[in-house]
């Protein structure tokens, strides 16, 4: 059984079922809504699996999205493609800039040709690297790396620390 968490790529960039996935998980809270307004998710699987395995749990546990929250996610889907395109372009610009920065040792972004899985990402993710990246700061040891990483976080002026991703805040 092949399960894929597609919350970073979303259906706008990657369709895991076409790549052989049996079950695909999507977070409606993150990119799909895009505004941080709901707690939602979707589990996509073959109809028989949903009927035989998931529906009994759903009936007993009550994990059903309210009509209003479903509507909110649907409204977010209307702008998903354009939001992800812009977010992915911005992430690529930032990744390129970080790759050249003297205080950065490594950038993790599948949209960069230097990424070891760049070709796979481009093939699977509609030719873009997505909207999320990470990087390592240059440091002599773990303590220095931690101190430098927190210095970067404390120096942010445009971005803020938050518990969600993919929304406009």
Residue ranges and their predicted role:
Residues 1-103, 108:
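Conserved PLP-enzyme active-site core in the AAT-like
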Residues 104-169:
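Conserved C-terminal alpha-helix-loop-beta "cap" of PLP-dependent enzymes
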